[in-house]
Regions:
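C-terminal capping/lid region of NAD(P)-dependent oxidoreductase domains
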Residues: 128-142
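Rossmann-like dinucleotide-binding domain that binds NAD(P)(H)
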Residues: 1-20, 24, 114
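C-terminal hydrophobic helical "lid"/dimerization subdomain
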Residues: 117-130
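C-terminal glycine/acidic-rich active-site capping loop/insertion
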Residues: 1-2, 29-110, 114
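Short catalytic/ligand-binding loop motif for oxyanion handling, primarily in non-cytosolic enzymes
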Residues: 17, 33, 119
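Short linear motifs in exposed loops
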Residues: 9, 35-36, 139-140
Length: 142
């Protein structure tokens, strides 16, 4: 959000693709890539070095990633567990509220009302763009 510009390409009906959700971020010094069909890996490609593949469940991942991992590395984990992480975060927030505990530094790791409002604004902007012939439309910041 420091004035960096990007492009979002999204399609729910790409011919020949079954699901293939992927996120790729490209910068001047390298890129990050994640593919839902291979969800346990994050690929880091530096412009001047061989690519690095980070796999979930290993000791080199951060504390947040370790906390969201339920099975040892090389064992499958994925879609259903992602929802379990959201529910666990919500349950922790409720338990903390009941016990009078403060939220952890950085807040809780689950979507809140602001995330929901931003998601709805995105959907409305996508519909508006579609009705305008796939033209760029202003995305309201919430």
């Amino acid at each position: 959000s420091d004035g960096v510009k990007g492009i979002l390409y999204a399609s729910q009906i790409s011919s020949g693709e079954e699901n293939n959700l992927n996120i790729r971020v490209f910068g001047t010094q390298g890129s990050l890539q994640w593919f839902q069909e291979n969800p346990n890996e994050l690929i880091f490609k530096k412009a001047d070095a061989p690519q690095q593949v980070y796999r979930r469940g290993n000791g080199y991942v951060g504390a947040a990633a370790q906390g969201a991992t339920r099975t040892p590395f090389a064992h499958p984990e994925g879609f259903i567990e992602a929802f379990a992480n959201i529910y666990r975060g919500a349950a922790t927030a409720i338990a903390d509220q009941i016990a009078g505990r403060k939220a952890p530094k950085g807040g809780y790791d689950f979507p809140n009302i602001d995330d929901g409002v931003a998601g709805m604004a995105f959907i409305q902007s996508a519909v508006k763009s579609g009705k305008a012939g796939a033209k760029w439309v202003k995305f309201p910041r919430t």
